Amino acid sequence: MTNDQVYAAGLLNKALDPATQPEAIRAFLRAEEVLLRELVPRRGRVVDFGCGMGRHLIGLLDVIALGVGIDYEWTYIAEANRLKPGGPLHFLVADATRVPLRSRFDAALCLTNTWGTMSDKLAILGEMRRLAPETGTRLITVYASTSVAPRRQWYTNLGHEVVEITDEHIRTSGGFVSEHFTEGRLRSLIGDCAISAIGDVAYLAQA
């Protein structure tokens, strides 16, 4: 199975269940939410790449003027539209490498290692830069190399036995591939950016 097929089979629903998450992963997810609220411009226009079921934008509803979430998986977008409590939130099915939007945004997000599961990272980064052109407004969170042990346990809890671990990725028996990064590799892919640690297992890159 490809990553697209694994997500279509409902991996995200299981992964967001705290009962499946090792403590290091739960701590990262909590810290990511706090950072996001600190960094997203108040009353800003925000686009979320790989938004899943919309949890990040829904969590920011009280501080943003507009939120647009995009994801290729229509079942997640349908659930995001069902869950949204109203307000200026919009969720749509789209290819993250060719987003059908022309508006300018104050921030572009790609969170919770979504970027680390995408095949064409540079094309997606290009779209993030197009929609949020100001330096420092593209926010990407990815797993660090130190995340391998808790992620291995997490994926096992999700029914995805790990069959391969390299310096750059974990591969499971179901075909799911999730990458991890060093600061050097992040800079080689993103270019000029500010990188900060999120707990012990992840990085935030502001590009």
Each PLM stretch: what is its role?
Residues 116-128:
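A short, conserved alpha-helix within the catalytic core of class I
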Residues 173-192:
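Short alpha-helix
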Residues 53-98:
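Class I SAM-dependent methyltransferase SAM/SAH-binding core
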Residues 1-41, 43-52, 139-164:
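Conserved class I S-adenosyl-L-methionine
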Residues 132-138:
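Short glycine-dipeptide loop
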Residues 97-108:
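A short acidic, Gly/Pro-enriched loop at the edge of an enzyme's catalytic core
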